[in-house]
């Protein structure tokens, strides 16, 4: 492929990408846009690393009851560093999650488990690849 053809193809792909919406399939099969997210950084107190990991594992069950939480990840970044990443169709879904059971449980246990308060950052989803 010549450079000119490559650049034309790249421009077409960029146009399609920017015109497309990101969709996730919900349990009912109806698509939902994923537009906003949260990134929550967590630093475990010394000796509480496995308790934080277990909290995140158990948190998944609580999130299952939140229809507007399209994706939710509890991740370990290092020996004592963890994070939660989740995405929502809109700010109402994000606010519902922040008022939900996982957030309440995290705040209730933060003093015991975390070296510092959770760092909660709101984000806009620019692009993603989701199953479905």
Residue locations for each model-derived region?
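Short hydrophobic/aromatic beta-strand micro-patches
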Residues: 41-43, 85-87
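Hydrophobic h-region of N-terminal signal peptides that target proteins for export
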Residues: 14-20
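A short beta-turn/loop motif at secondary-structure boundaries
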Residues: 75-79
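Short, low-order "capping/linker" segments at domain edges
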Residues: 128-132
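C-terminal segment of N-terminal export signals and the immediately downstream linker at the start
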Residues: 20-39
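Short, surface-exposed ligand-recognition loops at beta-strand->loop->(often short) alpha-helix junctions
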Residues: 43-53
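An amphipathic, aromatic/His-enriched active-site/gating alpha helix that lines ligand/cofactor pockets
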Residues: 2-14, 31, 58-71, 87-122
